[in-house]
UniProtKB/Swiss-Prot annotation:
Heterotrimer of A, B and C subunits. One of its GO terms (biological process) is translation. It comes from Rhizobium etli (strain ATCC 51251 / DSM 11541 / JCM 21823 / NBRC 15573 / CFN 42). NCBIfam families: gatB, PRK05477.1-2, PRK05477.1-4, PRK05477.1-5. Belongs to the GatB/GatE family. GatB subfamily. Gene3D superfamilies: 1.10.10.410, GatB domain, N-terminal subdomain. Signal peptide: none annotated. This is Aspartyl/glutamyl-tRNA(Asn/Gln) amidotransferase subunit B. The gene is gatB. It comes from the Bacteria.
């Protein structure tokens, strides 16, 4: 891969050192497990969490005479992902053997793709912000390639005092290795890139993106240089399995390399591991080059070839992706860029919002989903799939406000009841006497009582009409928040002689 610098040095991303400014250069190789029922070259299940060595075929265990057979669904998923990345789809690709020895690699080689990957160059647009002026910065990150390969098994060194165990459940599972160009210039950009990539594959249904289960793992390449100078020597941080850790690993590694260079040392090209407990990287091994793996075409697999019709069929079935959905939310529903960005960040959130917004005001639905629902889920440590409030329930609360049955304040209380206890919002309002008081006579009586009991406040209102809000608050308090706020405000102003 020829490295090309497409970014103009940006002072706000420079890292100050003892001898001047530095710039960090980041590229990523993301391993995304393909969503499929069976493995890349065998019929064994890919189900997560099964007992050790229960999802293993003779092919996965490298029994003599067992030949690989390509899984067509994995090929389709790779092409779908390539299309979602706005990438070039290569109609001819080749599987190669990547030779190295490890106990959890029973074949003694990994079937991967080297010179002829299934997907070529593409791009992802990330968005940073908002800044203090509420503006977002869009940055295009290049994709170098996407190729298919087998995952290895898992070595377990903590099961026995003198022996290591090997679990081959993961061996042979299809991976998409998505290689970015070295276009990122900060840890924030790298985190935004990983977040966006995970969102895209989840929308496409090609990877579940569950980093805690190992479905997405990142090898992060980090180097530093003086602004405007050629790329420096990079170090690869292997298998970083959370977005937060990606940011921490980059920041530590950049500082480590800057320290070495400022002390007159040189950076050694090597592979490192990130220790999340210490928040630092440590050396693992010297970095291998391609020739160390002795790549050659796998003689058991023919080149993978398909035509334009195959690609067009898959393209026709692609779902609406995050950027397109965000643009539609802004254009059709009048949402702010920020609100639309939050709502499309996860497919499950976007689906929930669209169910709530159907037939209702989009801005109102967005406010409830972002501020109330997501806020409550964040407080309780749950995600959108675990929400106790269904779209129908939240929609019903919004409908009750619009109908004038409840006020906005009562709606907040109703939401908390539905969140903790469940139930039909309309029935809860009826059974608990939460209906808004719209009887003008009853409201007028409450207003008269508050005014009569507070002559000093009445005098203050004459000097400062905005003090009328105090009376509105007192009436709402006296009625338990059930009085119609608009009716209260109108009566208070009329009684106090305040002109509209």
């Amino acid at each position: 891969m020829t490295l090309v610098d497409v970014r103009t040095p940006d002072p706000k991303r420079f890292i100050p050192g003892a001898t001047g400014d530095w710039e960090v250069i980041v590229g990523m190789e993301v391993h995304a497990q393909v969503l499929s029922n069976s493995k890349l070259f065998s019929g064994a299940s890919t189900e997560f969490g099964k007992p050790q060595n229960s999802n293993v075929s003779l092919v996965d265990a490298a029994m003599p005479g067992m030949l690989p057979v390509i899984n067509e669904e994995c090929v389709k998923q790779a092409v779908r992902t390539g299309l979602g990345l706005k990438a070039e789809i290569n109609k001819r690709s080749v599987f190669d053997r990547k030779n190295y020895f490890y106990p959890d690699l029973p074949q003694g080689y990994q079937i991967s793709q080297y010179k002829d990957p299934i997907v070529g160059e593409g791009r992802i647009v990330i968005s940073l912000g908002p800044d203090r002026q509420g503006q977002f910065e869009d940055i295009e990150i290049g994709i170098e390639r996407l190729h298919l390969e087998q995952d290895a098994g898992k070595s377990m060194h903590d099961q026995h005092a003198t022996m290591s165990y090997v679990d081959l459940n993961r061996s042979g599972v299809a991976l998409m290795e998505i290689v970015s160009k070295p276009d990122m210039r900060s840890s924030d950009e790298a985190k935004a890139y990983m977040t966006k990539l995970r969102s895209i594959v989840r929308y496409l249904g090609t990877c579940d993106g569950n980093m805690d289960e190992g479905s997405m793992r990142a090898d992060v390449n980090v180097s530093v240089r003086r602004p405007g100078e050629p790329f420096g020597t990079r170090c690869e941080i292997k298998n970083v399995n959370s977005i937060r850790f990606i940011g921490q690993a980059i920041e530590y590694e950049a500082r480590r390399q800057i320290g070495i260079l400022e002390d007159g040392g040189e950076i050694e090209q090597e592979t490192r591991l990130f220790d999340p407990n210490k928040g630092e990287t440590r050396s693992m091994r010297s970095k291998e080059d391609a020739h160390d793996y002795r790549y050659f075409p796998d003689p058991d697999l023919l080149p993978l070839e398909f035509d334009d019709a195959f690609i067009k069929t898959l393209e026709a079935d692609l779902p609406e992706l995050p950027d397109d959905k965000k643009e539609r939310f802004v254009r059709e529903l009048g949402l702010s860029v920020y609100d639309a960005s939050v709502l499309v960040s996860e497919k499950a959130i976007a689906d929930y919002f669209e169910a709530v917004a159907a037939g209702r005001d989009g801005k109102t639905a967005a406010n409830w989903v972002i501020n109330d629902l997501l806020g409550a889920l964040n407080r309780t440590g749950k995600d959108i799939e675990q929400t106790p409030v269904s779209p129908a329930q939240l929609g019903a609360i919004i409908d009750l406000i619009k109908a004038g049955t409840i006020s906005g304040k009562i709606a907040k209380d109703l939401f908390e009841i539905v969140l903790t206890e469940g139930g039909d919002p309309a029935e809860i309002v009826e059974l608990r006497g939460m209906k808004q008081v719209t009887d003008t006579g009853a409201i007028e009586k409450a207003v008269d009582e508050i005014i009569a009991a507070n002559p000093e406040q009445v005098e203050k209102v004459k000097a400062k009409p905005t003090m009328a809000a105090w009376f509105v608050g007192q009436v709402m308090k006296a009625t338990g928040g059930k009085a119609n706020p608009q009716a209260v405000q109108a009566l208070v102003k009329a009684k106090l002689g305040i002109e509209e």
